[in-house]
Every structure is written in C-alpha cells, then in structure tokens.
Amino acid sequence: MKSAYITVVGNLPVSFDMEQTRKLGPVIASANANRSITYDYATVNTETNLQDMLNSANFRGTELLAPEKLFKKYVFFDGVNCLPEFPGLKSYDIDPEKCSPQTLALMLAVYLKQTMVFLVGYDISNPVELTRLKSIAIANPATKFMYICNPPRTYQLDDLENGFCDTFIKFQELIDNA
C-alpha cells in the first residue's frame, strides 16, 4: 500500500533519529548532507556529491536521482537514475543542475504525489529556498507541507493554506501513532 506521507531531509544537520521517519513512508535525502540512515531516494546535482554518495555505505540501496546531464555520465553505475521531468519547472525558474538538492528533493516529493510532505532539516533561512518552497506549495494545493523545527516555532509558512510549522515533539507523536 502506498503511503500518504513522505519526508524530505534538507541540507541542515538534524539531531533526530531519522530511522523513525521510515514508519511514515519514504524518505528523500538532499545530496549527502545527512548520512544518518539509508534513504529511499536522494537528489544530487553535482559530480562531487554524487561520487561521494556512490562511495558511502549509507547510500547503498538508495536510488540516487540526478539531472539528465549528470546521469548520462554515470548511467552505468548501480543506483544512479535520471530525475523525472518535473511539470512547471520553467515557470518556477528552477534549473535542476543549478538549484539546491533540497529543492530537487521537494520537487521529487511533490512529483510522487504524497498528500503530506514533512520537511526536516530544510533550510528556509535562505530567501531563495523559502520563496521556492512557497511557490511549490501554492502550485500544489492538494499537498500539505509540514516544516519540522525545534522550539520556538517559526511562522514563515503561516501565509500558506497548505503549509505550517510544528516541532519535533509533535512530529515524534505522529510517528508514535503511525
């Protein structure tokens, strides 16, 4: 049975047992920033990160998704696949080869059509990243986006109908009740 939930692990370090998030559904890593578990998927758009991930035990068994140009160079490596064509990429002004891996991970989560996306360690202090997150959320009203943070709670997503912020405590309760 397909899960309704997916977790996107951003670029920031996370002090949370990420293995627990698997109870909720698939987990997507943003490049090689957090190596705490074996992920279902990882997005990568630089050759250096991809090589590092291919040589890391934590990414064995992880589907590594890269933009087409990078994928073509690594087509014969196990686990390396091409990112899907994301609808509306040009309207978001997002270049898969130049944007952050966490933006790619967010796009992948939306593409996989889960109803709830949990954002853990996701960097919204960068105005470009926050704007892209909000644009993607607005363009996908059927998907809920829950930004997980430590107290105090941030209010940067409160202007979105389908985006909100909550604490790791609430996230842990969700996991425990899964």
Language-model features: locations:
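Metal-ion/cofactor- or nucleotide/acyl-coenzyme-handling active-site neighborhoods
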Residues: 1-178
